[in-house]
C-alpha cells in the first residue's frame, strides 16, 4: 500500500482505495536537460510581467486620486465631528483637495524629469 515510502500502511478506515498514483507535479523537475531553458523562460515571464505593470500608469494615477479623496474624507469626518458649519467644511475640504492635487502634480513632474541613477546605468548597458 505504499510506494517509495509514500502512502498509507493500510487503506482500512481511510475512505480511499489506497491506490497511489505518480505525481505529475514534478514532471519537469525530473527532466534535467531542459532545466536551464525552463529557468530562462520563467525569468523572462517574470520580467515581462513586471514591465507590463510598470507601464500601466492609469492604475497609479487612480491610486493617487483615491489617496487624495481618502484624506479629504478623513478631514470631512473630523470637521463634522467638531460641529462646524457645512459651508466651512466644504471650503476646507476643497482647499485640502486643491493642495493635495498640486502636490501630486509636482511629484509627477519631478518624477518625469528625474531619472534615477540605476535606471540610467541600466539603459547604458
UniProtKB/Swiss-Prot annotation:
CC annotations in GO: cytoplasm; Prp19 complex; U2-type spliceosomal complex
Keywords in alphabetical order: Coiled coil, Cytoplasm, mRNA processing, mRNA splicing, Nucleus, Spliceosome
Coiled-coil ranges from the UniProt annotation: 59-114
Keyword ATP-binding: no
Compartments, as annotated in UniProt: Cytoplasm; Nucleus
Principal location listed in the UniProt entry: cytoplasm
One Pfam family, short name: cwf21
Biased composition (Basic and acidic residues): 37-60
Domain CWF21: 62-103
Xref: InterPro entries: CWC21, mRNA_splic_Cwf21_dom
Biological-process GO terms, alphabetical: mRNA splicing, via spliceosome
Chain segments carrying region Disordered: 1-60
Composition skew (Polar residues), residue ranges: 12-35
Disulfide bridges in this chain: none
Subunit structure: Associates with the NTC complex (or PRP19-associated complex). The NTC complex associates with the spliceosome after the release of the U1 and U4 snRNAs and forms the CWC spliceosome subcomplex reminiscent of a late-stage spliceosome.
PANTHER family referenced in this protein's UniProt entry, alphabetically: SERINE/ARGININE REPETITIVE MATRIX 2, SERINE_ARGININE REPETITIVE MATRIX 2
Family indicated by similarity: Belongs to the CWC21 family.
Function as written in the Swiss-Prot or TrEMBL entry: Involved in pre-mRNA splicing. May function at or prior to the first catalytic step of splicing at the catalytic center of the spliceosome. May do so by stabilizing the catalytic center or the position of the RNA substrate.
Name of the protein in question: Pre-mRNA-splicing factor CWC21
Record organism: Eremothecium gossypii (strain ATCC 10895 / CBS 109.51 / FGSC 9923 / NRRL Y-1056) (Yeast)
Amino acid at each position: 500500500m505504499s510506494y517509495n515510502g509514500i502512502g498509507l500502511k493500510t487503506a482500512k478506515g481511510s475512505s480511499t482505495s489506497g491506490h497511489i498514483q505518480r505525481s505529475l507535479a514534478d514532471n519537469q523537475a525530473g527532466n534535467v536537460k531542459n532545466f536551464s531553458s525552463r529557468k530562462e523562460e520563467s525569468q523572462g515571464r517574470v520580467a515581462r510581467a513586471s514591465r507590463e505593470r510598470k507601464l500601466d500608469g492609469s492604475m497609479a494615477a487612480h491610486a493617487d486620486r483615491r489617496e487624495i479623496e481618502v484624506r479629504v474624507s478623513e478631514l470631512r469626518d473630523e470637521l463634522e465631528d467638531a460641529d462646524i458649519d457645512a459651508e466651512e467644511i466644504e471650503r476646507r475640504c476643497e482647499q485640502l483637495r486643491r493642495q493635495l492635487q498640486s502636490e501630486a502634480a509636482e511629484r509627477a513632474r519631478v518624477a518625469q524629469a528625474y531619472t534615477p541613477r540605476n535606471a540610467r546605468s541600466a539603459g547604458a548597458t
